From Swiss-Prot:
Organism encoding this protein: Stenotrophomonas maltophilia (strain K279a)
Gene3D superfamilies, A to Z: 3.30.1390.10
Protein name: ATP-dependent Clp protease adapter protein ClpS
NCBIfam families, alphabetized: PRK00033.1-2, PRK00033.1-3, PRK00033.1-5
GO biological process: protein catabolic process; proteolysis
Region (Disordered): 1-22
Length: 108
């Protein structure tokens, strides 16, 4: 008696065996960090947080004050490609506006 097979299972002696599906690990995430400096105006930092990280004024102000008092702060957590893009955008925008504000990323 012929056995029928489907893409998801094989029949061996009347027992259905599901084909193994490869496990895919979730992508690693990275924190995008702003570093404090003594020259970049606070309102510029708030503008960066609103423009590049879609924060409202209250949240952007809170993060800016955290960066100012603690030396650095998290702007968001993203996949590597998104984090790299945001770091490059913020650093380029800061240089274009003649500010030394530095944005970095580290594994979350």
């Amino acid at each position: 008696m012929p056995h029928e097979s489907s893409p998801d299972s094989q029949h061996e002696h009347g027992v259905a065996v599901e084909a193994a599906r490869p496990e895919v690990a979730p992508p690693p995430f990275y924190q995008v960090m702003l570093l404090n400096d003594d020259y970049t105006p606070m309102d510029f930092v708030v503008d960066v947080l609103q423009q590049f990280f879609s924060m409202d004024l209250d949240k952007a102000t809170q993060v800016m004050l955290h960066v100012h008092t603690r030396g650095r702060g998290v702007c968001g957590v993203f996949t590597r490609e998104v984090a790299e893009t945001k770091v490059a955008q913020v650093n380029e925008y800061s240089r274009m506006n003649q500010h030394p504000l530095l944005c970095t990323m580290e594994k979350a």
